[in-house]
Amino acid sequence: MTKKKSNDKNNNEKIIANNRRAKFDYEIIETYEAGICLTGSEVKSLRTSSVKLDDAHAQFTKNNELEIVNLHISEYKNNAKISVHKENRPRKLLLHRREINKIISKISKDGLSAIPLKLYFNQKGLVKLLLGIGRGKRNVDKRDSIKDREWKINKQRTFKNFNH
């Protein structure tokens, strides 16, 4: 028997890393899917999920290109010492020109930040980065989001107990 193909895009994605802290620290307004320029040893290292997205952010260069900085990809352990990559080097993001222009205008004019949300392999096996454009939350906003989350949990508990 043959398996039916699913129309769901997320079935074949293998998530490498999630930036869970970003959704707590930033109010995400828009997201973009971007490719990323990597060397062979970096891709091998990503297959073992040895990456840190915590301090990473996107910035634009003098050539009006976007690059991700402070993305820490650890050294591949089984690699020859000749082709070792730098762990924290800036990596170019691959987007269409109109998307880059949109992001750059939002970063420079509106005072928003570009934060990586998720790093994953897509259906074709290519490394993709989900880039979020957002505004930083203040402590009051963080407390409000915690209160909302706790209220939803308590509401679900009461409805669950009420139905039984």
Feature-to-residue mapping (PLM):
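Intrinsically disordered, Lys/Arg-rich N-terminal extensions and targeting peptides
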Residues: 1-34, 39, 147-164
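Ribosome large-subunit tunnel/peptidyl-transferase-proximal elements
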Residues: 13-112
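Intrinsically disordered, low-complexity acidic/polar segments
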Residues: 67, 77, 128, 138-140
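C-terminal end-helix/capping segment
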Residues: 88, 95-98, 136-164
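Beta-rich strand-turn-strand
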Residues: 94-132, 136-138
